[in-house]
Regions:
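Extracytoplasmic redox metalloprotein regions
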Residues: 42-43, 49-63, 73-291
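Bacterial Sec-dependent N-terminal signal peptides
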Residues: 13-38
Length: 291
């Protein structure tokens, strides 16, 4: 009586693993190239960006698998392997916000704000109107916390809808979010003193490719990307990291030189590491609550 579900599951698994097209089967027209060269895959499932290239084997395949587990496995608040979550956080794994290296639907839409089950999949940036941070808070509002610890606050969103018309008379509707923060862990911040920006997760696609490119190639492509008629001027973003000027390649608006500078482990999950050894809530009451 269990044969049908098992067969169906196997069929679904194989359908996701192989869509029947291999890179060797593709004839590329002159003047064109595959987006990832020989690493291009042709899956149409949600796992298309969450797999290694077909030719990755041996030690490199093991390295990819270990990195993929590090990315997807849920963090706990223990001190052992796979631990380190909190005391405050926004998501409990990289994959929780970036499902299959893509985007996870944020609770901003499904629950109208902060998630009710220890997960939100969004970042709430808070600051003063002049850009300075508040003394009892960092740059991100951590709306989740481990057991026994109070989150920094909770986000609520309400939407207003407005109807407009195209020149031909066809109507369309725009949705405007109105954010508010409640249950502040310390002194409440007045709305008129607060600048709040809510961001949904970015896709984590092609970062390894960017790291492998020669910086001069990126600079040459940027120089060609000039379209003044559209108000577009291609230019690279240069950043200073540890006193060294580098080409920005990763992060929001290319603000980081490489993936080691990504703040996700520290800022989003509260996991300390060799790059960011301090707790994300250093100096706040949650440090003692979570110890």
């Amino acid at each position: 009586k269990y044969s049908f579900p098992i067969c169906f599951s196997l069929l679904a698994l194989f359908a996701c693993e192989n869509d029947g097209i291999d890179v060797d089967d593709i004839e590329v027209p002159a003047g064109f190239a595959l987006s990832a060269g020989t690493a291009t895959n042709f899956l149409t499932s949600s796992y298309a960006y969450d797999r290694s290239a077909d030719w990755i084997t041996g030690a490199y395949d093991k390295r990819f698998t270990r990195g993929d587990k590090l990315y997807d496995d849920i963090r706990t608040s223990s001190n052992g392997i796979g631990g380190g979550l909190g005391p405050v956080y926004a998501g409990y794994s990289c994959g929780s916000c970036h499902r299959n290296a893509g985007r996870t639907q944020p609770t901003l839409w499904s629950e109208g704000g902060s998630g009710s089950s220890g997960f939100s999949s969004m970042l709430v940036y808070i600051s003063r109107k002049n850009g300075a941070f508040f003394q009892d808070y960092g740059r991100v509002l951590h709306d989740q916390a481990i057991y026994g610890v109070k989150p920094e606050g909770k986000l609520k969103v309400e939407y207003t809808y407005e109807t407009f018309q195209f020149p031909d008379g066809e109507t369309y509707e725009l949705c405007k979010p109105n954010y508010s923060i409640y249950e502040w862990y310390a002194d409440s911040i007045k709305p008129e003193d607060l600048f709040c920006t809510v961001r949904i997760p970015l896709r984590h696609v092609g970062m390894g490719q960017m790291m492998a490119l020669d910086p001069t190639e990126i600079e040459a492509l940027a120089a060609k990307s000039n379209y003044p008629e559209y108000g577009i001027s291609g230019r690279c973003n240069y950043i200073s990291e540890r006193g060294v000027r580098s080409l920005g390649l990763s992060g929001n608006k290319a603000q980081h030189a490489d993936l080691t500078v990504e703040l996700g482990f520290s800022s989003d999950m509260g996991v300390t590491n060799s790059r960011y050894p301090e707790e994300i809530c250093e100096g706040q009451a949650q440090v003692n609550q979570g110890s």
